[in-house]
């Protein structure tokens, strides 16, 4: 069995794989709670990807489970990494592209990862990872309007889209954040289709189902794309 751990800005996500088959997933704000959900498994290999520093105590907990490998932007993958500043590339972005490569090998694809940040990652049909873009995610947009102004309240995220015309401050903030992000995603997809008419679009990340609902179109969503990508890389090296 393989254990895949993805340390994000907000939560830690984990997946258990038997070869290439995903057997179980979990997510938690603490490593202890996450690992407790995998107690019944014995692991041969562990792959870790992180965008945050992992405390030594947490690493000790992981190492008790098995031999660990860290995934970084310089790790060998089936993709050719053409990013200009490889050392600054977030491991989650490359891992998501590797996950999409399992689905679209031989075709161009754009991964839209809707999490704390909204990340766009493009790979051409030759398997060259070229990069993309990063912008604030939905919760970050809502929080920023509160933290960078004196009087705007903090409006919590919910799954219901705001009306086009907000008739009070809270609904106006929701409209700007929610419909603004939705319009951004629609616009970026259109630009990529102009750049490459054959590009495949795949969504992942915690807010992906929310975007799918707002786009009202037949889009492909895989919430476990990063975990699958990391597992494929681990198997690639075994």
Language model: regions and residue ranges:
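Nucleotide/phosphate-binding catalytic cleft detector across ATP-hydrolyzing
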Residues: 1-11, 15, 21-109, 126-238
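Catalytic metal- and UDP-sugar-binding loop of GT-A-like glycosyltransferases, i.e.
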Residues: 112
């Amino acid at each position: 069995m393989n254990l895949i751990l993805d340390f994000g800005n907000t939560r830690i996500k984990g997946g258990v794989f038997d070869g290439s088959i995903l057997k179980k997933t979990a997510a938690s704000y603490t490593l202890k709670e996450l690992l407790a959900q995998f107690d019944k498994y014995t692991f041969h290999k562990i792959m870790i990807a992180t965008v945050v520093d992992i405390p030594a105590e947490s690493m000790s907990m992981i190492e008790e489970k098995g031999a660990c490998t860290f995934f970084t932007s310089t790790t060998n993958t089936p993709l050719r990494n053409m990013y200009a500043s490889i050392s600054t590339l977030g491991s989650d972005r490359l891992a998501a592209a590797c996950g999409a490569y399992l689905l679209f090998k031989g075709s161009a694809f754009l991964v839209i990862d809707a999490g704390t940040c909204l990340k766009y990652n493009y790979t051409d049909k030759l398997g060259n990872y070229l990069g993309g873009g990063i912008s604030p995610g939905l919760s970050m947009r809502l929080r920023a309007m509160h933290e960078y102004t004196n009087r705007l309240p903090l409006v919590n995220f919910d799954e219901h889209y705001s009306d086009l015309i907000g008739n009070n401050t809270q609904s106006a903030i929701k409209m700007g954040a929610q419909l603004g992000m939705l319009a951004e995603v629609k616009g970026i997809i259109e630009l990529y289709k102009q750049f490459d008419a054959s590009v495949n679009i795949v969504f992942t990340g915690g807010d992906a189902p929310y975007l799918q609902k707002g786009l009202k179109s037949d889009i492909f969503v895989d919430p476990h794309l990063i975990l699958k990508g990391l597992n494929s890389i681990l198997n690639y090296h075994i």
